[in-house]
């Protein structure tokens, strides 16, 4: 689960992290009052969307102006102008894809006199099964370029969960950033604060980009990006309250209501599979034969007929779907249950695109009989390779 920048800063504040003052707004009419709560004479007007690269992004609408999603205002009138232009407009960044995201919230923040910009993040490192820090002197909007062109400028280290954060971790951060004396002490303190917040709130990722050194000698988190482990949300009700469903894919929201693992992709072949490994293999073989998957959808091992029907409805709700592949290996999940769910869904929502069903495992003959006797135009496949070729050929033929 992701949250907005202003929410992330509110999460960090109780842990003592040094932050700039700011006010979030939902309406352009609130911009003047928000700016007057901050000292000025410079304000930063920031688009709040669940995507990075806002500063380099561009708005689709000409009425939003030529500047990006993060703008520097030198007067309250300019704050008001930017708010009027940006709210309701569609911001396109490298992370949003060409469709972009509508800006429904802005964060108006006091300006900072910046001396240096750094990069600091924490993440759950699968390789070490620990929380790892990623640190670089090359902060700001171009960290992706740094990672690609000069990876030696990025330093990482992990924290042993048995000991937790220790003073030497702070010293590593300070040394990497070239900080000494009082600034090294600030770096050590910040390292502890961020790690404590990361663990306490069950985060998956915490990115501070940039972490700045102000001209008056203070380390300050100028931006904050946060994501949380969805499996831990039951014990983080304050985090759940921050969820903004307008930033999420409507199909993914519907899938979560039925406990379906669904991720929207950009292809044309909808997939319904049981088991994450088989689902990944299904996506791969679709690509192998020249098409792209429209989604990842794992119905799980104990899906009911109703759950399968819901999954099918979610897939068919995607206008980009030109064909559907159902690939089931029945273990706990029974093939006849899948078959009944698919037939029920087809009868409910209709079938306007090719459908290929591959069943194998528990009650496979019963499942195939249900599909065969349904009278519906469903193609049956004997194995995964056969299924992938049939759906790809059917989609190309229908195009």
Curated annotation (Swiss-Prot):
The UniProt record lists the keyword Ligase: yes
Positions contributing to substrate binding: 274, 331-333
UniProt-annotated binding residues for Mg(2+) = 209, 223
The first-level EC class reads: ligase
Pathway(s): Carbohydrate metabolism; tricarboxylic acid cycle; succinate from succinyl-CoA (ligase route): step 1/1
Where along the chain is ATP bound?
46, 53-55, 109, 112, 117
Q: What protein family does this chain belong to?
A: Belongs to the succinate/malate CoA ligase beta subunit family.
Name of the protein this chain belongs to: Succinate--CoA ligase [ADP-forming] subunit beta
State the gene name recorded for this protein.
Answer: sucC
